[in-house]
């Protein structure tokens, strides 16, 4: 009976998480749609603006997040096997990589501010065209919103690692909690995998 109740609780928890993730996909989906519309309406201006972005830094951050996804997957697998040390190691590795992503993004923003690429810190007349201004506005909004999600994810990963280490989340019974946070982190990574080509590789 207890196993049935636990299975139902897990299914309910995962369903709630899937609904939340769907809402996040719709949020970023709207930004992707705007980017596509801009690309179709103003191809030359958008391509010119995209070429000024630091695609090398973006590529490095893509590798960082993909590696963090692997770490989370290993943490979930360890949690399901009841291995607390492996779970903590995977969660902390992913959190550390998340911090690395944010640090690289901060450096990139600093470069872009100095190069007068970010509309929030640059007069409107410094841009080649209104379309370029709008595209770089979209870039800042999308990447900053994503960075907020990464920050939340890092907090969740670190907090969960602390709970597991302190035995506040017994394993494997508490593996669902690790799985839920893992799903969130994977979504954050997938969103970036789409953001990178949409924003940096427009040609």
Where are these regions (language model features)?
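...captures the hydrophobic TM-helix bundle architecture rather than a specific catalytic motif
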Residues: 1-203
